[in-house]
Structure formats: structure tokens, C-alpha cells
Amino acid sequence: MTGFRDQLGVHAQALVLRETRNNLLTSNIANAATPHYKARDIDFGAELARASGNGTLRTTEARHFAAGGPAARGEALYRDPVSPSLDGNTVEMAVEQMEFAENTLRYQTSLALLNRRISGLMTAIKGE
């Protein structure tokens, strides 16, 4: 028998990661005028794979390198700007706003899918 968490699938993990990404993006936007501030983000796909247990790399030969670096540890990465600012700030407002809007839309979609999944489970529990 599978647990309740297993029934929610990847949607619950996606929701948490979307919230984390949203916090990073809003921090970037809030610090757009802060000198030497470095814009940060996460690799959502890699983080979701890691959170769902699919993120471990399989080594098929002894000479393979182990995965490493900030992305492998689940840390926020620094974003490289297309056109860097003279004050050292790497926030590009248009990029941040676009990423924020897309992430918000995907957050709402994940929430709707999770709500539907929970409604389906409640219907099954009630026997309707």
C-alpha cells in the first residue's frame, strides 16, 4: 500500500520548489538597484529530479566523475547577465520579471493539479 504523500506525485515537490524559486526571483527584483548584488536562481528541472529521487547519477565505470558543484547540492546558482551593469549588479529587470511571471503561472498550475489530485483522493475515500 502506498502512502498519502506517494499519491500526490511530483506536484507537492514542484509546489515547494516553485515557492523557493519565487522567493529568489522576488529577492532579485527587490535588489535591482543594489550595487554588486548578484542575481540568483535555481535549476528547477534538476532540483525537481533530485527531490523526486531521480537526481542521482548512475556511474557505469570506475573512471566516471561524481556529480558535484552547487547545482548538485541544491544551492542557488548565480545568473550571468547578458549586459552587465557598471555597478556590478547582475539583475536584469526584464529577465527577472519574465521568469517571475512564468514561475507564478507554473506555481498556480501545480497548485490546481494538486487540488484536483486531492479532490480525487477525497472522492475515493468517501466512496462517491
From Swiss-Prot:
The UniProt record lists the keyword Transmembrane: no
Intracellular or extracellular location(s): Bacterial flagellum basal body
Keywords in alphabetical order: Bacterial flagellum
Gene Ontology terms: cellular component: bacterial-type flagellum basal body, rod
Family assignment from sequence similarity: Belongs to the flagella basal body rod proteins family.
NCBIfam families from the UniProt entry: FlgB
Name of the protein in its database record: Flagellar basal body rod protein FlgB
Lineage: Bacteria, Pseudomonadati, Pseudomonadota, Alphaproteobacteria, Rhodobacterales
